[in-house]
Design a protein with these regions (language model features):
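Non-catalytic peripheral regions of nucleotide-handling enzymes
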Residues: 1-87
Length: 87
């Protein structure tokens, strides 16, 4: 069953490559090495609002253990979070 979290759950990114894509991250007490990047995109919402916008950089990837997931970097909080995990 696919699980998703609109605001994401915290992950610990241990390393990023030259393009800023995670090459390893920690989640739920386990280390995950990234096998392959599938897709990358950016989203900016509410750019017109006085209180500011939310800007995120998303990556869909597969880990070496076969976990298919979507992570995002939140430019406002400077944190990496996991948004979705596919079964």
């Amino acid at each position: 069953m696919t699980k998703s979290w609109a605001d994401g759950l915290p992950v610990r990114v241990e390393a990023v490559d030259a393009q800023g894509v995670p090459s390893a991250f920690g989640w739920q007490g386990q280390a995950h090495a990234v096998e392959r990047l599938l897709q990358r995109w950016e989203v900016e919402t509410d750019w017109w609002a006085e209180e500011g916008s939310a800007r995120r950089s998303y990556v869909a990837l597969i880990t070496r253990t076969g976990l298919l997931c979507v992570l995002f970097f939140d430019f406002g909080t400077t944190e990496w979070r996991i948004a979705r995990v596919y079964d």
